[in-house]
Amino acid sequence: MFLAPDNAVKQLFRSLSPSWMAKLSLSYERTPIGTVLKKSLHEGPLRVQKALYPEGDDICHTVIIHPPAGIAGGDTLDIQVAVGKGSHVVLSTPSATKWYKSFKNPATQNVQFELGENAKLDWLPQENLFFKGANSNLITKLNLPASASFIGWDALMLGRHASGEEWSSGHIHLLNEIRRDGQLIWIENGHIDAEDPYSKSLPQLGSWPVCATLLALGPQCSNHLAENLSEMMPWTNSIRAGVTLMPQGIVIVRAVSIDIEMARNFMIDVWSKLRPIIHGVPAQPLRLWAS
């Protein structure tokens, strides 16, 4: 498939460049003046902008800056976030994370969240965009006590359909683990293989190029909440979604779509519905969503 010159050169440059390891460690605490970013340590091209407070001092917003050229084979992103007792943190990214073709080793993103008592976390990254030939590992691990609450999502876009590039080759490994007080309560280990017919079957993705998952945990998660959410689940030729409450008290919303913007807007709507219930604060759209 022919690529526009700029994109072709950029992808080739990143794919052939030496791989790198980037680390980011963030620690938040609740103080008398609100939630503060107490520690920010980084190695390599992965860092954060300054702490922002568009909702007031109680809620700390932080934007994680990914490498601007994207992620190629052999690269590793390691992100560790500790949200202290009583803190409320909103984490986001400014743009899509691009996963380029891997010629040898896979690229890996490893994200770990540790929440304290009564802590609250919104994990709202932009989508992951997988180029043809991408070989990627996405690992997310969460540990929280029963009193804490979490809302987070991940969206995957397979191929660059606007440029006419189908995701005809590549592999994605997804691993999600959730622990409550250190005890494993949920594990999801999935594989998406572009050349596997099952990956394009109805039980998996049904040939939809976009898929998204939202997870919510907290004392307010209930059957009643899941039933209310079910009323806003679309089922059209452009986007389809469903909601489930797991016995462990995890609300899971999954969606597939033909368009990433449509999926993103749907997830924002679900988050806006959940946030006042799960976190006890109004939903305020992030400014970067409008850019």
Swiss-Prot record:
Required for maturation of urease via the functional incorporation of the urease nickel metallocenter. InterPro entries: UreD. GO terms for cellular component: cytoplasm. UreD, UreF and UreG form a complex that acts as a GTP-hydrolysis-dependent molecular chaperone, activating the urease apoprotein by helping to assemble the nickel containing metallocenter of UreC. The UreE protein probably delivers the nickel. Pfam families: UreD. GO terms for molecular function: nickel cation binding. It comes from Polynucleobacter asymbioticus (strain DSM 18221 / CIP 109841 / QLW-P1DMWA-1). This is Urease accessory protein UreD. Belongs to the UreD family. Keywords: Chaperone, Cytoplasm, Nickel insertion. Coiled coil: none annotated. It is found in: Cytoplasm.
